[in-house]
Swiss-Prot record:
It comes from Arabidopsis thaliana. It is found in: Membrane. The modification Phosphotyrosine is found at residues 412, 512. Residues 309-659 are cytoplasmic. This is Cysteine-rich receptor-like protein kinase 18. Belongs to the protein kinase superfamily. Ser/Thr protein kinase family. CRK subfamily.
Length: 659
């Protein structure tokens, strides 16, 4: 009985060691040769920020993204990539888990990469210098399968060499087709007589040339042949290329590998990696018990330390991130020529916006809050905390802030084409927005809100979505701006209430105005209004005549729907580059967004699917909120369920008491 107990304990211990090794050993490399950083320094905070948003950016860019955040010397460059054909959810999960693994493993290295995955292959890399287009051969990550080949090595080598050579040739000769994520990718199988199939996968990053890809993959093959020949598979990975083969089918980067109990040393030259030797010495029951006790206690201490550290991290993240993004007031004054009038870009509800240029040549937009503005220090800090945690191609990027004396300044990336309303509601500029451009703007706004609601590590409710808060870059790509009113939701939180309603009339949902209740569906309502404005070129806050009655835009569109004349909504300035079916579908989606009951409105993920997949059947919309039922004795400012006086003012409302 004692022997059986010892055997059970031994089995548990061996299982634990193998399981623990499988988790900790991976094809990741923290590079010590390019410098280190101090934990919680500006560089570290920028690193955490860009990695936290990498998954959403990768999925938004069809499987491949490269970008940077911050200002030198704290600027962090990062890239993320998934294997072609990866499902969005699978890709997003792979990027998120891989990013988190890098943060936990590379504690102070300024350069690191990790090829990872179970259901799909993905890459995450960050560095303190630009690397796009540059072939980097060091360091090398190496893992080999501990199982040994049991076949004729000569015959096996011939098939193995033929397979790897043909794959490399195929990858580098057909690199021009497909999108970035499908460039330089191949998986293949070869049959070894009287043995098993060889499954192999290769991929390069799409930013390098085909010649560099060829060089990188060939060196991976050579390194494996020199270090690990005779084993049943393994992984060789570099920052720009990945190679894996096994004697069984696989999909991800490290799943199902029978990993050694400790990782082999990295290969920097074609020298063999030391094999893991097995010891057959007997271990006494007392020693086994002692080992198990020590192991369990160690695990408990590690978990406890992780929980405490995570709680401290969460508390720190809610504080103002002063170290990473704070600018000296004199720096901002110098960049804007002391807030010169000629540098003024415009004036918003909370102050003025100025163009500036930092000493390193970076163009910036400085939001200078007026001393009498409704946005106080609480809202100011809220905008800094919220935006500093976000990174997406369709969100304006916060570079920093300054809070000195009475001056409250927010420093954003400069977006050259001003805001959407500057074009949309101008009688001469709106003709620059053809249907293709308006459709792309709607799609970009959709992805930005979807990121806020679902894909970022925070759940953000914007609460002030409107045309003037959508900025347009040089390529007319939309960027959501102005997060002063935004609220962070908990993971499981869906609805919140407030006694202080903020936002802009015409864009605010009925339940928010009348009851102070807001949720993701409040943003959906605002987005629906935006869709209708973008298609019509009309402001929701304006009033229109139809059948001799006064209407707001939402009511006007609803009556067009009832009359089956939605085509009348289309802005006459839109060029003839559209189909009426597509335009009507977009109007239909807009009406679904502005339905009175929040439960009837679709989520942003459903909206994205509706916009991108025309085969999805749209439900019939119900009457919208603030639908004016005009008639004898009726008040034109009355909705179908609540009496409410609408304002046509475009300024953001900061203090309204809900009923």
């Amino acid at each position: 009985m004692a022997t059986k107990s010892c055997e059970l304990v031994l089995c548990f211990f061996v299982f634990f060691v193998i399981s623990f090794s499988a988790i900790s050993v991976s094809a990741q490399t923290c590079d010590n040769t390019t410098g280190t950083f101090i934990p919680n320094s500006p560089y570290d905070k920028n690193r955490r920020l860009i990695l936290s948003t990498l998954a959403s950016n990768v999925t938004a860019q069809e499987g491949y993204f490269i970008g940077s955040i911050g200002i030198a010397p704290d600027q962090v460059f990062a890239t993320g990539m998934c294997a072609p054909g990866s499902e969005r959810d699978v890709c997003s999960l792979c990027i998120r888990s891989t990013s988190e693994s890098l943060l936990q493993s590379c504690l102070d290295q300024a350069d690191a990469f990790f090829w990872s995955g179970e259901e799909t292959l993905c890459l995450v890399r960050y560095a303190n210098r630009p690397f796009s287009g540059l072939l980097v051969m060091d360091p090398l990550g190496a893992i080999f399968n501990t199982g040994e080949l049991n076949t004729n090595q000569t015959v096996f080598d011939i098939e193995w060499n033929n397979l790897t050579s043909s794959m490399i040739a195929g990858i580098t000769s057909s690199s021009s087709g497909g999108n970035n994520s499908s460039k330089y990718y191949s998986d293949d199988i070869a049959l070894v007589p009287d043995f098993k199939n060889i499954s192999a996968l290769m991929q390069c990053t799409p930013d390098v040339s085909s010649e560099d890809c060829n060089t990188c993959l060939r060196q991976n093959v050579v390194d494996y042949d020199n270090c690990c020949r005779g084993h049943q598979g393994g992984v060789m990975s570099r920052p720009n290329c990945f190679f894996r083969w096994e004697v069984y089918p696989f999909s991800g980067a490290i799943d199902q590998i029978n990993l050694p109990k400790s990782p082999p040393p990295s290969v920097t030259s074609p020298s063999p990696i030391a094999n893991i030797t097995k010891n057959d010495s007997r271990i006494s029951g007392g020693k086994i018990a002692a080992i198990v006790v020590v192991t369990v206690v160690t695990i408990i201490l590690v978990v406890l330390g992780f929980v405490i550290s995570n709680r401290r991290k969460q508390k720190q993240e809610m504080d103002l991130p002063t170290e990473s993004v704070q600018f000296d007031l004199k720096t901002i004054e110098s960049a804007t020529s002391n807030f010169s009038e000629r540098n003024k870009l415009g004036k918003g509800g909370f102050g003025e916006v100025y163009k500036g240029m930092l000493m390193n040549g970076t163009e910036i937009a400085v939001k200078r809050l007026s001393k009498t503005s409704g946005q106080g220090e609480v809202e100011f800090k809220n905008e800094v905390v919220v935006v500093a945690k976000l990174q997406h191609i369709n969100l304006v990027r916060l570079l920093g802030f300054s809070l000195q004396g009475e001056e409250k300044l927010l420093v954003y990336e400069f977006v050259s084409n001003k805001s959407l309303d500057y074009f949309l509601f101008d009688p001469t500029k709106r003709n620059q927005l053809d249907w293709t451009m308006r459709r792309n703007i709607i799609g970009g706004i959709t992805r930005g809100i979807l990121y806020l609601h679902q894909d970022s590590r925070l759940k953000i409710i914007h609460r002030d979505l409107k045309a003037s808060n959508i900025l347009l870059d040089a390529d007319m790509n939309p960027k959501i701006a102005d997060f002063g009113m935004a609220r962070i939701f908990g993971v499981d939180q869906t609805v919140a209430n407030t006694g202080r309603v903020v936002g802009t009339f015409g864009y605010m949902s009925p339940e928010y105005v009348t009851h102070g209740q807001f949720s993701m569906k409040s943003d959906v309502y605002s987005f629906g209004v935006l869709i209708l404005e973008i298609i019509s070129g009309k402001k929701n806050s304006s009033f229109y005549q139809m059948d001799g009655l006064v209407n707001n835009l939402v009511t006007y569109v609803w009556k067009l729907w009832e009359n089956k004349s939605l085509h009348e909504l289309l802005d006459p300035f839109i060029n003839q580059d559209f189909t009426s079916e597509e335009v009507i579908r977009y109007i239909h989606i807009g009406l679904l967004c502005v339905q009175e009951n929040p439960a009837d409105r679709p989520t942003m993920s459903t909206i994205h699917q509706m916009l991108t997949n025309s085969s999805i059947t749209l439900p019939v919309p119900l009457p919208p909120g603030f639908f004016f039922r005009n008639g004898p004795g009726s008040n034109p400012g009355q909705s179908n369920s609540k009496s409410f006086a609408c304002s046509v003012d475009e300024a953001t409302i900061t203090d309204v008491n809900p009923r």
